[in-house]
């Protein structure tokens, strides 16, 4: 009995999905991810000391995303590589991710980008905002993006000008979140909170996570523009 299965015929991963383990120890997480009875698995596990463990072969469909959605795709497990990053998570004492661990995440993701046509690098909370928080607001997404893995908002004046109008119109704002990839059926506040965890973590210091503001919309517009350019580059 295995806790993974073949990918659908002809399907190659185009997404990297990052998680935290949310368990008290690395050993407990590794045991759970390797246990067929758990019905949970990931392709890789990265310890806090930077050690990387291969759990599931990349050509197999691991079971890490659960009920999830991104950009019209509801079978995230089939199109993704799942990476579990050791951290106790919000339940057991959430803490920053050590530099050596982040370095291992970067190296692994860079390798995946060389082997596959990766168009999305996301967190579990992005694809399942209503039930997941990982890898969370302490994860250094900005640093990853600066080193070529994933996207990070780089706003221009036009973004801020448009944000002044859109931030006052929830209907228009919701359409933009859906355009980026979020599930239109997910509660709006959950989507905004997930966006903040990934792309505007500083807002958690103010206690205003989940609230729409002009800066949130400006960042959202920047990401939509970058994603459009990335998709165009991948086609060329």
What are these regions (language model features)?
Residues 1-119:
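Active-site-adjacent loop/helix surface patches within enzyme catalytic domains
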Residues 94-198, 202-236:
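Basic/polar, cationic surfaces and motifs that engage anionic cell-wall
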């Amino acid at each position: 009995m295995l806790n993974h299965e073949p990918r659908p015929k002809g399907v190659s991963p185009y997404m990297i999905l990052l998680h935290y383990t949310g368990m008290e120890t690395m050993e407990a997480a590794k045991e759970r991810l390797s246990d067929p009875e758990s019905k949970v698995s990931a392709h890789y596990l990265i310890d806090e000391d930077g050690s990387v463990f291969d759990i599931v072969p990349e050509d197999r469909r691991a079971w890490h995303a659960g009920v999830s959605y991104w950009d019209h795709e509801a079978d995230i497990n089939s199109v993704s590589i799942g990476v579990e990053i050791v951290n106790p998570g919000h339940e057991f004492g959430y803490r920053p991710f050590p530099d050596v661990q982040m370095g291992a995440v970067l190296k692994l993701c860079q390798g995946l980008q060389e082997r596959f046509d990766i168009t999305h690098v996301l967190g579990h909370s992005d694809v399942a905002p209503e039930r997941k928080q990982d890898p969370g607001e302490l994860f250094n997404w900005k640093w990853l993006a600066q080193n070529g893995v994933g996207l990070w908002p780089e706003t221009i004046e036009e973004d801020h000008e448009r944000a002044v109008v859109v931030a006052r119109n929830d209907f228009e704002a919701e359409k933009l979140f859906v355009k980026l990839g979020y599930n239109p059926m997910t509660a709006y506040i959950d989507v905004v909170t997930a966006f903040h965890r990934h792309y505007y973590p500083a807002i958690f210091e103010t206690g205003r996570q989940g609230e729409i503001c002009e800066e949130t919309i400006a960042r959202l517009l920047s990401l939509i523009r970058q994603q459009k350019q990335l998709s165009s580059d991948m086609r060329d």
